[in-house]
Amino acid sequence: DYDIAGAATGVVDASKLLGPERVTDGDVVIAMASSGLHSNGYSLVRSVVSRVGASLESHVAEFGRTLGEELLEPTRLYTRLCLDLVERFGVGGIHAYSHVTGGGLAANLSRVLPQGAIATVDRSTWTVPAVFDWVRRGGDVTWVGMEDSLNLGVGMVAVVSASVASEVLSAINEAGVAAWVLGSVTSAGADGTVAGFGSVSDLSADSSGVRLISGTKGVQAGAVLLHGEYRVG
């Protein structure tokens, strides 16, 4: 058996670099749909397949195809689309991108935010594809465990200026990739509260499903506030 890995290195002018230093309060957080599992979480998936005794050749009605075909759906690539958006809207419009890989949406998005910034993400703004709910049910995994591991239908996130958000949404959808507004960027007030959610210090222990995620993957940057309930396809 062999493990095969590939990597690519890009070069960009310093004046065109995106990242936390460009993100500001009021920026809009836009999701781009994933095509499926995106090559992440397959250790969990394999354990679920084994646990439920599923055959990869079996037809799954909720997928409309076999289990194997669903699990092996090719990963959507966003390279050309992301480059085109920067070319069209510039670094004044596109402030940061976050590729949602292992660790889930919040862990990856928080790393492209500046310290002190909080991106509010509403879970109810999209429908989680059926394959993720199949994994959740088959593995008896909580939604917290799922959102800390898999992309749940969001493959790429763009943090953009509010002034161009509607145009960016249209451009992504016109390129054939479903896109929607996840939320926006804000920051805690001087009293340590986030408008509509209360004290930051209380959010990590919130029992209503509100979670504040920060300091992930060894990076001390911004934070992501998850709220709302998932809709399942």
Range-by-range predicted roles:
Residues 21, 37, 52, 113-115, ...:
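Amphipathic, positively biased hydrophobic alpha-helical segments used for protein targeting
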Residues 23-71:
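Acidic, glycine-rich loop-and-beta core segments that form the ion-binding/anion-interacting portion
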Residues 1-2, 62-72, 76-233:
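Glycine-/charge-enriched secondary-structure boundary and capping motifs
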Residues 1-43, 184-186, 229:
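Glycine-rich anion-binding loops of enzyme active sites
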